């Protein structure tokens, strides 16, 4: 084994642009405290979840089996008295597509909470019905009743279908009809709108929102565009809508009925090569539009966005948001969820790990990769890649990160977030001075190390291993 013989002081003068980009994106979606959005208070996930709930609006577990078992019926007829009671007219049955998509929407709720749905005429802890109407309700596109509204109302949802309004006739992945189904089912389960507003009651706007995150970027129970929170779910001129509950919806429904930890409790891949069995969690083409929040019960899990060519920003931390496949803030991770791995695509990606032992692959492009804590396995892929570290604890001796494809002259190891521009002194052996760094490389194994004594105790408190030799000029400090 040979040691680098260079003795130099390398300084970035300050934290690098790469570190600043990582740091900025990691805090972009911070919530709560004294933060504001558009002059409105910023709510934490827990605060937003509470905002979605209403006192007494929940089903009871009558048989004590630890979950809410609901039955449902697609109505085949409705009397004039029933229609009059709801202020509507022009009944029609759900078509085959509506029925199939309603089942998928219900499944998305049962995935995240202890709720089951069975098509049956009656029974269970509560009963739900679905039907269409052609006029009434002041032109509302759909409406539903929260539990506790009263007999003949609980579990009821209605959908406008006529020659002037057709989205509810053709619900499908990521379209407004599918979101409407999932939204209305959310009401029948006990979730309200995030604010005190309803369609047909005045002309509500985002100005009526109580808090800043009341948008469809955080909750599909919201009326307001994700653009209000600087997110963008449009691609190729087509807007995508969530087909399953989003980050705040998941927290809210779990407050009511508990979390379903049986969902995706094994090793699960989201995005490309998905094994979720859920259309809205899967991608097969660069043209796909993903809008989802990850709920995962356990295992070793992966966000695989390798099939996208756009520049992406991926964050593996719980309650975080990512920019995936040309959209902005379109993928989030629910509170309490750990996702271990992330795969970028062909663009210039920014990827942030968490404190688990992550596997991060940048793919093609000039990527910025930050593994954070844990013994991470890192691949930059083709291109000029920068591996960023923000604390000595990000890669400790005994739990060191390993870069599997380091190419000297193209790739960088960026420690400027630790040194804050103070630089490093490259030596052959530690001298007891803070900032001493030792580079080693063994040609026989093609393995190198970068060890740094940040504390000045004469031993390394930071260590990263490389497959491939790193030179002093490859280190940004």
From Swiss-Prot:
Binding-site residues for Ca(2+) 8, renumbered to this chain: 453, 455, 461
Organism for this UniProt entry: Pseudomonas marginalis (Pseudomonas panacis)
PANTHER family according to UniProt: MATRIX METALLOPROTEINASE (PTHR10201), MATRIX METALLOPROTEINASE-21 (PTHR10201:SF323)
Entries under Gene3D superfamilies matching the protein: Collagenase (Catalytic Domain), Serralysin-like metalloprotease, C-terminal
Binding positions for Ca(2+) 1 per the UniProt entry: 264, 266, 268, 296, 298, 301
Full protein name: Metallopeptidase AprA
Binding site for Ca(2+) 2: 299, 301, 338, 340
Signal peptide: 1-20
Gene Ontology, cellular component aspect: extracellular matrix; extracellular space
């Amino acid at each position: 084994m040979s040691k680098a013989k260079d003795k130099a002081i390398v300084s970035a003068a300050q934290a690098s642009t790469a570190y600043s980009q990582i740091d900025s994106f990691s805090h972009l979606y911070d919530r709560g405290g004294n933060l504001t959005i558009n002059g409105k208070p910023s709510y934490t996930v827990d605060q937003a979840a509470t905002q979605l709930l209403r006192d007494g609006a929940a089903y009871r577990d009558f048989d004590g089996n630890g979950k809410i078992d609901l039955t449902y019926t697609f109505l085949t007829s409705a009397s004039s008295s029933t229609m009059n009671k709801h202020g509507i007219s022009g009944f029609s049955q759900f078509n085959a597509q509506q029925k199939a998509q309603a089942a998928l929407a219900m499944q998305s709720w049962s995935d995240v909470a202890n709720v089951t749905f069975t098509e049956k005429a009656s029974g269970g802890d509560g009963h739900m019905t679905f039907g269409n109407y052609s006029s009434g309700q002041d032109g509302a596109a759909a409406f539903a009743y929260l539990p506790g509204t009263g007999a003949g109302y609980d579990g009821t949802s209605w959908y406008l279908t006529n020659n002037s309004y057709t989205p509810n006739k053709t619900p499908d992945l990521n379209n407004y009809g599918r979101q409407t189904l999932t939204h209305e089912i959310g009401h029948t389960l006990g979730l309200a709108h995030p604010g005190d507003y309803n369609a047909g009651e005045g002309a509500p706007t985002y100005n009526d929102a109580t808090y800043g995150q009341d948008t469809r970027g955080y909750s599909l129970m919201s009326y307001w565009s994700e653009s209000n929170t600087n997110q963008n779910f449009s691609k190729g001129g087509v807007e995508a809508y969530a087909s399953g509950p989003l980050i705040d919806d998941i927290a809210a429904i779990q407050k009511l009925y508990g979390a379903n930890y049986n969902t995706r409790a094994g090793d699960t891949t989201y995005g490309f090569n998905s094994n979720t069995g859920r259309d809205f969690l899967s991608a097969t083409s660069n043209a796909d539009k993903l809008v989802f929040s990850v709920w995962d019960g356990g295992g070793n899990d992966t966000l695989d966005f390798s099939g996208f060519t756009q520049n992406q920003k991926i964050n593996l931390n719980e309650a975080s948001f990512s920019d995936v496949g040309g959209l902005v803030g379109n993928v989030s991770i629910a509170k309490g969820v750990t996702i271990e791995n992330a795969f970028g695509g062909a663009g210039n990606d920014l990827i942030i790990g968490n404190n688990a032992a992550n596997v991060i692959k940048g793919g093609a492009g000039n990527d910025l990769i930050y593994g954070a804590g844990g013994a991470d396995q890192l691949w930059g892929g083709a291109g000029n890649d920068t591996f960023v570290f923000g604390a000595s604890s990000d890669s400790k001796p005994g739990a060191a990160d390993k870069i599997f494809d380091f190419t000297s002259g193209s790739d960088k190891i960026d420690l400027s977030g630790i040194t804050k521009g103070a630089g490093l002194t490259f030596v052959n052996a530690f001298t007891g001075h803070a900032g001493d760094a030792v580079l080693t490389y063994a040609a026989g194994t093609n393995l190198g190390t970068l060890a740094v004594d940040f504390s000045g105790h004469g031993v390394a408190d930071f260590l990263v291993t490389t497959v491939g030799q790193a030179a002093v000029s490859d280190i940004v400090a």
